[in-house]
Amino acid sequence: MHNIPAALAEMLRGLAGEAERIGHLHPEQLAIVYEQGWFNLFVPRSYGGLELSLPEGLRIEEELARLDGSLGWTVTLCSGANWFVGFLRPEIARKLFADRRVCLAGSGRPDGVARVIRGEDGEPRGGVGRMSEVNGEEGSAWGEYEVTGRWKYATGAPHATAFTANCRIEKDGVLLENEDGSPVVRAFLFLREEVMIQEDWEVIGMIATASHSFAVRGLRVGEDRCFRIDGRAAFLPQAIYQYPFQAFAEATLAVNFLGMATRFIELCGEVRERLGMVRETFYTAVQDSWEECVRGRGVPTELLAAVGEASRQLADESRRLVDELYPLCGLRAARPGTEINRVWRDLHTASQHPLLRPAIADGSL
């Protein structure tokens, strides 16, 4: 695991209970995160980031999740959103990342609608775009949009400096579709002062992630606020922006299960062998895929599939192992004020994330 100094680790863990009580990361936890640059794990040094490789960043996220589930999850989701710096237009990225406390939050669900605004001549501002352009395959599409939407689960909302969100595109009152019938979706960036935060995060665990909803209504934004998460659309040259987003998301979430399960086992006893074997398989899969990405040859499909499978296996085994041990922990594990109870609640709340949730046999969910 990443070697976080013992005194720092003790301070972060010691503040976890108070962070849960107040419903968001403790100010002293945040101060450490900013000082260490953890929201910028995958941001280039030229933008003030740590510029870590994926395996290096994963080990930090794992260790933070071991110290405090809400802390690890928040750093993971926010550093994942800050990773979008590679796909933002440089003039926008420079302004955002001039703030040492830059922290992006957001949602991947297309729960907003961006209406193409027409100019006086009746044409979309910026010129008429083909369908492939709207989908981000061939540069600028329209020019200006009016966005309305509400998005759930924006981890780190209270301290976010900007928000990202996916929207369907509407033109002439019609929601556009791609040639295969799927909806045309674009990613947008909103500044903090442009959104309304709705404090509705009420769950049994991961309380201090403060994963509230946010909304915009009739917000006008230009084409420079749109971006596409695709290596072909990256503005920055680092290998991390060529690593496929699906595998990146799976791996970064999975290590949080590993960190929380490791801590749960530490609190229960020394039963580590099973989790250790799954951990080794996971990091081997990530390392293999990362090395291919760094070589610039593209990551083979089978290696990406191995990352996905190892991530799901890691999350599933973490859940199973914790649930096997829970009945042996006594009443202290059922008391909300104890660390072992908080770890259990955090892990089981995190396990509801759809990316790594087990498939339902009848396909109903």
For the regions a protein language model found, what residue spans apply to each?
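C-terminal helix-coil-helix/basic helical segment that borders enzyme active sites and/or dimer interfaces
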Residues: 13, 17-20, 277-313, 326-334
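Glycine-rich cofactor-pocket loops
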Residues: 19-23, 237, 242, 248, ...
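Glycine-rich flavin
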Residues: 27-35, 40-159
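Glycine-rich phosphate/cofactor-binding loops in nucleotide/flavin-utilizing enzymes
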Residues: 125, 327-365
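DPxDG-like acidic metal-binding loop motif
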Residues: 150-194, 330
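Glycine-rich beta->alpha junctions and the first turn(s) of the following alpha-helix
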Residues: 203-276
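Generic structural signal for well-ordered, non-transmembrane alpha-helical segments
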Residues: 259, 272-276, 308, 312-319, ...
